[in-house]
Amino acid sequence: MTNEIRAIFDRIAPVYDQLNDWLSLGQHRIWKEMAIKWTGAKPGDTCLDLCCGSGDLALRLARRVGSTGQVYGVDFSANLLETAKQRAQAQYPQPHISWVEANVLDLPFEDNQFDAATMGYGLRNVTDIPRSLQELRRVLKPNAKAAILDFHRPNNQQFRTFQQWYLDSIVVPLADRLGVKEEYAYISPSLDRFPIGKEQVEIALQVGFTSATHYPIANGMMGVLIISK
């Protein structure tokens, strides 16, 4: 299963950013900045961005921690990491980011290493959510926070119907024109499988986080889980 998901993200790498704009109605940048603020990351911190994709969230984190800080962007898709590296190389001054190809279920870091962490649109796609949160907790310093941003199924039936219409009528046809229809058809079933907010809170507490709060945004079509070690 992990290899299948990795293959999907390797194939969609060239159009990943464009489709994220469509999936979020262009709002993902605002939500990413909100997530970073909630982590409490500050200049000089060492931060982690899991499932970093094309690097957008990691680059934003790097701006927050500045020249005295360090960010590690982790993803298991080599193609997406290459896109992230190219984006970083095009910036001046060069952001302090190390790109790491790894699985979030087995992070190549020491315990208690990071001051803050983010994960954008990744938790829904991991094969073992409790295990990924355990690993995240392991590498965070005591009292450190993480913000996990992702798409969700809204509780409200009207918004749920709109979300499904939007996916079927806008996103998947766009993906088809870009040559990745089959790859983006996975989104709807992944939303159906994804634990709702209160279930995410329960999982986070069960694996040892001292506090966990889930905030629905965009009428429940998006949410951010804030967890503290």
Swiss-Prot record:
EC number(s) on file: 2.1.1.329
Record's keyword annotation contains Transferase: yes
GO biological process: methylation; phylloquinone biosynthetic process
Tree of life domain: Bacteria
Pathway recorded for this protein: Cofactor biosynthesis; phylloquinone biosynthesis
Catalyses which reaction(s): demethylphylloquinol + S-adenosyl-L-methionine = phylloquinol + S-adenosyl-L-homocysteine + H(+)
InterPro entries noted in UniProt: MenG (IPR032904), SAM-dependent_MTases_sf (IPR029063), UbiE/COQ5_MeTrFase (IPR004033), UbiE/COQ5_MeTrFase_CS (IPR023576)
Family annotation (HAMAP family): MenG_phylloquinone_subfam, MenG_UbiE_methyltr
Protein name: 2-phytyl-1,4-naphtoquinone methyltransferase
The organism of origin for this protein: Trichormus variabilis (strain ATCC 29413 / PCC 7937) (Anabaena variabilis)
